[in-house]
From Swiss-Prot:
The lineage of its organism: Eukaryota, Metazoa, Chordata, Craniata, Vertebrata. Induction: Up-regulated by endoplasmic reticulum stress and CREB3. This is Homocysteine-responsive endoplasmic reticulum-resident ubiquitin-like domain member 1 protein. GO terms for biological process: endoplasmic reticulum calcium ion homeostasis; endoplasmic reticulum unfolded protein response; ERAD pathway; negative regulation of endoplasmic reticulum stress-induced intrinsic apoptotic signaling pathway; negative regulation of intrinsic apoptotic signaling pathway; positive regulation of ERAD pathway; positive regulation of ubiquitin-dependent protein catabolic process; protein targeting to ER. It comes from Homo sapiens. Residues 112-124 have a biased composition (Polar residues).
Length: 391
């Protein structure tokens, strides 16, 4: 006789997926089969599930009844975790739900036989009546997972107890189906031309309020005749900023204090640049060239600052004549009847001031052009001084 195999105890921890019950820890043998373990769970598990309703999962794999635990559970571990999924049926609530389902299925079946002879349509209406006639306690029970599965099992063979969708998802699918069916119906009726739009709200005619009568002489200043011969008024703003320069891009440029008052960093940068220029000039040229360039640079700097102006600026003498007297009530047509000045009619006659300006605009000489080039070259080497402030 073959010797009996020694029992190999193993500890199993059974967990519920919906966490309705606490984890059950039990002791078993590695020689058990999965069917034997299900039969043991039907006796010790709180809800007493039947073996055919149980589903055991280990490491993500569904265990079959003929498999042995010795082949599934590794020997290195003494404790193994199993997940139990089962369809639990409550015997206390099942008679009430079955009675409600039976009553609801009999009533719509008798009333709809004459109207709807087809079986498919009657089945659909029967199922919808079942869901509609459930009372409030029934809805409270269906809100729980196990009660929802019981309700689906009681509806008929068309519904599965292990549906992957929840109760809210199924109702949402039903709403989407009804909306899609309604849109198809509207599209079909609109294409056939028999679509009647729903009665809209009663349109109330809008009565515009009459415009008020204009007030006589509301703006007396505008109704007065303007003086055509009045001199234009010059508005002088005494508080305007006088330190403004015109910008080529448009708009004035306000003089800032940073351009007038330089700080020590600007003076240090200027001194460093000038020292680099002197070092290059001293080491890469002779002493005579160095002194000549330095003298010319100093003279150009003094001229640039304004100490040695080579040519005084022309002073324009404007005649200090008062403004012409305003002629009151002058006829604008009198300007056409007055005699013109013979000096203005003669194109060869020019005023003395214009002769002087034309004499100054003669072509520059070669020396003035050379001096301008020399001055511009050395002036570009010198830093730009602060701009003059207008008085």
């Amino acid at each position: 006789m073959e010797s009996e195999t020694e029992p190999e105890p193993v500890t199993l921890l059974v967990k519920s997926p919906n966490q309705r019950h606490r984890d059950l820890e039990l002791s078993g043998d590695r020689g058990w089969s999965v069917g034997h373990l299900k039969a043991h769970l039907s006796r010790v598990y709180p809800e007493r599930p039947r073996p055919e309703d149980q589903r055991l999962i280990y490491s993500g794999k569904l265990l079959l009844d003929h498999q042995c635990l010795r082949d599934l559970l590794p020997k290195q571990e003494k404790r193994h975790v199993l997940h139990l999924v089962c369809n639990v049926k409550s015997p206390s609530k099942m008679p009430e739900i079955n009675a409600k389902v039976a009553e609801s299925t009999e009533e719509p079946a008798g009333s709809n036989r004459g109207q709807y002879p087809e079986d498919s349509s009657s089945d659909g209406l029967r199922q919808r009546e079942v869901l509609r006639n459930l009372s409030s306690p029934g809805w409270e029970n269906i809100s729980r997972p196990e009660a929802a599965q019981q309700a689906f099992q009681g509806l008929g063979p068309g519904f599965s107890g292990y549906t992957p969708y929840g109760w809210l998802q199924l109702s949402w699918f039903q709403q989407i189906y009804a909306r899609q069916y309604y849109m198809q119906y509207l599209a079909a009726t609109a294409a056939s031309g028999a679509f009647v739009p729903p009665p809209s709200a009663q349109e109330i005619p809008v009565v515009s309020a009459p415009a008020p009568a204009p007030i006589h002489n509301q703006f007396p200043a505008e109704n007065q005749p303007a003086n055509q011969n009045a001199a234009p008024q010059v508005v002088v703003n005494p508080g305007a900023n006088q330190n403004l320069r015109m910008n080529a891009q448009g708009g004035p440029i306000v003089e800032e204090d940073d351009e007038i008052n330089r700080d020590w960093l600007d003076w240090t940068y200027s001194a460093a640049t000038f020292s680099v220029f002197l070092s290059i000039l001293y080491f890469y040229s002779s002493l005579s060239r160095f002194l000549m360039v330095m003298g010319a640079t100093v003279v150009m700097y003094l001229h640039h600052v304004g100490w040695f102006p080579f040519r005084p600026r022309p002073v324009q003498n404007f005649p200090n004549d008062g403004p012409p007297p305003d002629v009151v009530n002058q006829d604008p047509n009198n300007n056409l009847q007055e005699g013109t000045d013979p000096e203005t009619e003669d194109p060869n006659h020019l005023p003395p001031d214009r002769d002087v300006l034309d004499g100054e605009q003669t072509s520059p000489s070669f020396m003035s052009t050379a001096w301008l080039v020399f001055k511009t070259f050395f002036a570009s080497l010198l830093p730009e001084g602060p701009p003059a402030i207008a008085n």
